[in-house]
C-alpha cells in the first residue's frame, strides 16, 4: 500500500496515512495465531535489517514480569543495541519465578537462531494473564515462522499484541533532517490496568534515524513522563508495562543529539507519536465511551501539575459523572483538593468543555442544557487554572461504564 502524507498543523512533520511500526526503512513486522488464544493472533515480532540503537522504560510495579527482567538485562549487556523484538499476548509470564526467566531467554535463543543474530540483540515482551507458565511448544512454533513472508504484515503484529483492546493502535510520521526524509513509526496495546506510571500497556517505536542509544534513552524517558505516564484507565499498574524504541540508522545524516540544529524537530515528532499512542490507549479503556483530557496550568511545579491532572482523571467519581454526562464539577474540585498538591481555592478556575464552572473557588452558573449537549461528545476536556505559577501538564483517561465491570469480572474465563 502506498503511504500518503498529511502535514500536521503547527508541526514540522507529516502524518503518514496508514503508517505503521514497519514504515521506517529497514523494519519488518508480523504476527500469527499460535494457540495462546482461542482464535485471535497472539504472537508478533519486529525485525530490523541492521543493528539498532535501542532503549526502553519499564513498569514501576515491584512484581516485574520475567520478559521485562530479561529485556532490561539484554539491553545492558548489548549496550543498547537490538535487532529484533518478539511479543506474545494472552500470557504475561509474570509471577513465574526462575522458570519464567528461563522461558523468556529460551524464546530469545529460538528467535536469534531463526534470524541468525546474537540472542543479546533480541528483546522479549508478554501481556495477558498473570501466574501461568508459557506453553513453550507453542512459542517455539511461533519463532519458527518469523521468516515466513505470509505472516509479515504490520497489521498482523498490531493484532497479535492485543488483549482486551477493541482496536489496534498505530501511527507513523515523516520529517526532514539534514535534507533527508526520516520516519518514526509506532504501535501500542492497552485497555485495562492503565495507570501512571505505565500500566498494562506495551508500546513500540521504530525509526530509521541515526541516534545513539544513550541519547535515545534520555529522549524516551522525557517523552514517557508526559505521555504514557500521564494516562489512566482504572488505577491499576501492571507487571508487564514497557515502552521500547529502536533506531536503525538506515538514513544517513548527522547523528541526532541535543547539539544538532534540528534536534527539537525530531523531539517534536517523537513526542507526537508517543502522545498519539497514549491517547489511543486511554480512549480504548475497557468499556470506555469517552476520552477525558485534563489540562492543568498555573501550578507551582511540573510535578504538582502532573499529579493534579492524574488525580482528576483517576477519580472514579469524575469518570462516572462523565459517563453519565453529568456536569458534577464538585467531583473535579474535590479531586484537586485531595491531590496533596499546593493549591489556593481563591485562585482556582475550572472549565468543563470550555464552559466555566468554577471561578476563584466559587461555583459559576451555566446553561445546563448547553453543558449536557457537550458532554454527549466522545472527547471531554477539563481545564484547571491554579493561578500559582507557570507549570502545566495534561493527563488522559476515560469514563467508567457498566461494561468495565462486565469485562473484568470474567477476564480469566
UniProtKB/Swiss-Prot annotation:
Keywords in alphabetical order: Acyltransferase, Amino-acid biosynthesis, Arginine biosynthesis, Autocatalytic cleavage, Cytoplasm, Multifunctional enzyme, Transferase
Pathway(s) per entry: Amino-acid biosynthesis; L-arginine biosynthesis; L-ornithine and N-acetyl-L-glutamate from L-glutamate and N(2)-acetyl-L-ornithine (cyclic): step 1/1; Amino-acid biosynthesis; L-arginine biosynthesis; N(2)-acetyl-L-ornithine from L-glutamate: step 1/4
Active site: 200 (nucleophile)
Residues under site feature: Involved in the stabilization of negative charge on the oxyanion by the formation of the oxyanion hole: 127-128
One GO process term, biological-process aspect: L-arginine biosynthetic process
GO MF annotation, one: L-glutamate N-acetyltransferase activity
Substrates-to-products reaction catalysed: N(2)-acetyl-L-ornithine + L-glutamate = N-acetyl-L-glutamate + L-ornithine; L-glutamate + acetyl-CoA = N-acetyl-L-glutamate + CoA + H(+)
Compartments, as annotated in UniProt: Cytoplasm
Name of the protein this chain belongs to: Arginine biosynthesis bifunctional protein ArgJ
Taxonomic lineage: Bacteria, Bacillati, Bacillota, Bacilli, Bacillales
Amino acid at each position: 500500500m502506498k503511504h500518503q502524507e498529511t502535514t500536521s498543523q503547527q508541526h514540522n512533520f507529516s502524518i503518514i496515512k496508514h503508517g505503521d511500526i514497519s514504515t521506517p526503512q529497514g523494519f519488518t513486522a508480523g504476527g500469527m495465531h499460535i494457540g495462546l488464544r482461542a482464535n485471535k493472533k497472539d504472537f508478533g515480532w519486529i525485525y530490523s535489517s541492521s543493528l539498532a540503537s535501542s532503549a526502553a522504560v519499564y513498569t514501576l510495579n515491584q512484581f516485574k514480569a520475567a520478559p521485562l527482567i530479561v529485556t532490561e538485562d539484554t539491553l545492558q549487556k548489548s549496550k543498547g543495541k537490538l535487532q529484533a523484538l518478539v511479543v506474545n499476548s494472552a500470557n504475561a509470564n509474570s509471577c513465574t519465578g526462575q522458570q519464567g526467566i528461563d522461558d523468556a531467554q529460551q524464546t530469545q535463543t529460538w528467535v536469534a537462531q531463526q534470524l541468525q543474530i546474537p540472542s543479546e540483540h533480541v528483546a522479549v515482551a508478554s501481556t495477558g494473564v498473570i501466574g501461568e507458565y508459557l506453553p513453550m511448544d507453542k512459542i517455539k512454533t511461533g519463532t519458527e515462522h518469523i521468516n515466513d513472508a505470509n505472516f509479515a504484515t504490520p497489521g498482523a503484529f498490531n493484532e497479535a499484541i492485543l488483549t482486551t483492546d477493541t482496536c489496534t493502535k498505530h501511527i507513523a510520521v515523516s520529517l526532514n533532517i539534514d535534507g533527508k526524509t526520516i520516519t518514526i513509526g509506532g504501535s501500542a496495546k492497552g485497555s485495562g490496568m492503565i495507570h501512571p506510571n505505565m500500566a498494562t500497556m506495551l508500546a513500540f517505536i521504530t525509526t530509521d534515524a541515526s541516534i545513539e542509544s544513550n541519547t535515545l534513552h534520555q529522549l524516551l524517558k522525557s517523552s514517557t513522563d508526559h505521555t504514557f505516564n500521564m494516562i489512566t484507565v482504572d488505577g491499576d499498574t501492571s507487571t508487564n508495562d514497557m515502552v521500547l524504541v529502536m533506531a536503525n540508522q538506515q538514513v544517513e545524516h548527522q547523528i541526532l543529539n541535543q547539539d544538532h540544529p534540528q534536534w527539537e524537530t525530531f523531539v517534536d515528532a517523537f513526542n507526537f507519536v508517543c502522545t498519539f499512542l497514549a491517547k489511543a490507549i486511554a480512549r480504548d479503556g475497557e468499556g470506555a465511551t469517552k476520552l477525558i483530557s485534563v489540562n492543568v496550568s498555573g501550578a507551582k511545579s511540573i510535578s504538582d501539575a502532573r499529579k493534579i491532572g492524574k488525580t482528576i482523571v483517576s477519580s472514579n467519581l469524575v469518570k462516572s459523572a462523565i459517563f453519565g454526562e453529568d456536569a458534577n464539577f464538585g467531583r473535579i474540585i474535590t479531586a484537586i483538593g485531595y491531590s496533596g498538591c499546593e493549591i489556593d481555592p481563591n485562585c482556582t478556575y475550572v472549565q468543563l468543555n470550555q464552559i466555566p464552572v468554577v471561578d476563584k473557588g466559587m461555583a459559576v452558573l451555566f446553561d445546563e442544557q448547553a453543558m449536557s449537549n457537550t458532554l454527549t461528545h466522545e472527547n471531554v476536556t477539563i481545564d484547571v487554572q491554579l493561578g500559582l505559577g507557570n507549570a502545566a501538564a495534561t493527563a488522559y483517561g476515560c469514563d467508567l461504564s457498566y461494561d468495565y465491570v462486565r469485562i473484568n469480572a470474567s477476564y480469566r474465563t
